Amino acid sequence: MNPFRWSFRAQFLLGFLACAGLLAYAIYVQLHLGLEPCPLCIFQRIAFAALAVFFLIGALHGPRAAGARKVYGVLSFIAAGVGMGIGARHVWVQIRPKDMMSSCGPPLSFLSETMGPFEVFRTVLTGTGDCGNIDWRFLGLSMPMWSMVWFVGLALWALSAGFKARRSSLHH
């Protein structure tokens, strides 16, 4: 069973399940392994959640029209692209020399209570302290690096599903 030959609905369902699994693992790492997320981690989670929503809506809708499938593909690609941008910033913060680090700033909850949304976004993206810590690795890659890998893969998956016409036994 080649997943690239699956129906749009099945491919978008798989994309949703991948995002849900990644978010579940992030919560597991936080609650059971004690790794608190930094503000950039939280923004990456939001990007994965947005991507999951687009995948789920696309899977539930299962449009027959090629144009509608393309819209879902592009929306999902944009959500993944935002996640890639945040992930790239996070990786950059992690690879900077430690002597160039500054504080990541106050917690996100405090920022959101005292600033507008655009100021919070700008402040979080300029934070570097805790965001630069590497507390977890798998196969030599940090969690933000793995997020980048997943965002790239899911972006390509969304475009592949949205821009290829296909009919299969898994259609509905």
Swiss-Prot record:
Keywords: Cell inner membrane, Cell membrane, Chaperone, Disulfide bond, Electron transport, Membrane, Oxidoreductase, Redox-active center, Transmembrane, Transmembrane helix, Transport. One of its GO terms (molecular function) is protein-disulfide reductase activity. GO terms for biological process: protein folding. Required for disulfide bond formation in some periplasmic proteins. Acts by oxidizing the DsbA protein. SUPFAM superfamilies: DsbB-like (SSF158442). Belongs to the DsbB family. It comes from Xanthomonas oryzae pv. oryzae (strain KACC10331 / KXO85). InterPro entries: DiS_bond_form_DsbB/BdbC, Disulphide_bond_form_DsbB, DsbB, DsbB-like_sf. Residues 29-46, 89-145 are periplasmic. Pfam families: DsbB. NCBIfam families: PRK04388.1. GO terms for cellular component: plasma membrane. Disulfide bonds join 38-41, 104-131. It is found in: Cell inner membrane. It is a multi-pass membrane protein. Residues 1-11, 64-70, 165-172 are cytoplasmic. This is Disulfide bond formation protein B. The chain crosses the membrane at residues 12-28, 47-63, 71-88, 146-164. The gene is dsbB.
